[in-house]
Amino acid sequence: MYNVGKIVNTHGLIGEIRVIATTDFPEERFQVGNTVYLFEKNSKKPEKLIIRSHRKHKNFDLLMFEGLTGIHQVERMKEGVLKIKETQQTDLEENEFYFHEIIGCTVVTTDGEELGEIIEILTPGANDVWVVKGADKKEKLIPYIADVVKEINTNDKKITIEVMEGLLD
């Protein structure tokens, strides 16, 4: 299962929850009628939930679920995580990848030098930035742009980059 949101609080008295989306597709993931799975804090057993309503409010997604109509029924969800099954993922365009496909990949240069493993993806704006942790425990920031990233092989968990001047300084 894959994370699509973290519940940070309740909202109002009618059973809405406040979610920070961890998906690039919140409008699609949180569409009315869709199923998500709640993993409450300190629980390994998921609860299947069907989305009854979705709206944006500031930087949050506000959700309500079928059968849950009051704050007293959703307070327990605080700090929980919403997930979807792998079969619920949508197909991506060419050269688009899910974060979970990229995180854990080994990054090597076109000269064959291994730089480390991608441990995180930042989304600051125009393009994603991959955080690569090397054997020396230092983190390097690699922009996901065509001039740098030359090949992505998610099956082998290997990414080849061309090191531009100043990139690793």
From Swiss-Prot:
Is rRNA processing a UniProt keyword of this protein?
yes
Gene Ontology MF: a single term: ribosome binding
| Superkingdom to which the source organism belongs | Bacteria
Q: Could you tell me where this protein is found in the cell?
A: Cytoplasm
Cross-referenced InterPro entries: PRC-brl_dom, PRC_barrel-like_sf, RimM, RimM_N, RimM_N_sf, Transl_B-barrel_sf
- The question of whether Chaperone is a record keyword is answered with yes
Q: Transmembrane ranges?
A: none
Q: Name one GO cellular component term.
A: ribosome
Indicate the segments forming the PRC barrel domain, all copies. Answer: 94-167
Record keywords: Chaperone, Cytoplasm, Ribosome biogenesis, rRNA processing
A Pfam family (short name) is: PRC
Q: Which GO terms describe its biological process?
A: ribosomal small subunit biogenesis; rRNA processing
Stored HAMAP family: Ribosome_mat_RimM
Q: What is known of its domains?
A: The PRC barrel domain binds ribosomal protein uS19.
What is this protein for, i.e. what is its function? An accessory protein needed during the final step in the assembly of 30S ribosomal subunit, possibly for assembly of the head region. Essential for efficient processing of 16S rRNA. May be needed both before and after RbfA during the maturation of 16S rRNA. It has affinity for free ribosomal 30S subunits but not for 70S ribosomes.
Complexes and interactors: Binds ribosomal protein uS19.
Please report which protein family the annotation says this sequence is part of: Belongs to the RimM family.
This chain belongs to the protein called: Ribosome maturation factor RimM
Source organism: Listeria welshimeri serovar 6b (strain ATCC 35897 / DSM 20650 / CCUG 15529 / CIP 8149 / NCTC 11857 / SLCC 5334 / V8)
